[in-house]
Swiss-Prot record:
GO terms under cellular component: cytoplasm; small ribosomal subunit
Keyword flag Chaperone: no
Coiled coil: none
Gene Ontology MF terms: structural constituent of ribosome
Organism of this sequence: Pseudoalteromonas translucida (strain TAC 125)
Matching Pfam families: Ribosomal_S16 (PF00886)
Bilayer-spanning residue ranges: none
Name of protein: Small ribosomal subunit protein bS16
A GO biological-process term: translation
Phylogenetic classification of the source organism: Bacteria, Pseudomonadati, Pseudomonadota, Gammaproteobacteria, Alteromonadales
């Protein structure tokens, strides 16, 4: 099953997440199909906290992809901000 979820990057104690479309059988930080954005939970000042390619997310959801709980909340927030 294809899912849209977070892929962790960054340094210890300083997380940075890529938002990726991946098969649910692949490991969290492993192979993915497409990168559709990023999420920086510790952004400060004028730094961009989230960037999301909403048309691609809509495309994948239309193809049957499911959203992880956290990504669903991020998509909702991104739609509200747009």
């Amino acid at each position: 099953m294809v899912t849209i979820r977070l892929q962790r990057g960054g340094a210890k104690k300083r997380p940075f997440y890529q938002i990726v479309v991946a098969d649910s059988r692949f490991s969290r930080d492993g192979r993915f199909i497409e990168k559709v954005g990023f999420f920086n939970p510790i952004a400060a000042g004028q730094e961009e906290k989230i960037r999301l390619d909403l048309p691609r997310v809509e495309h994948w959801v239309g193809q049957g992809a499911s959203l992880s709980d956290r990504v669903a909340k991020l998509v909702k927030d991104a739609r509200k901000a747009a």
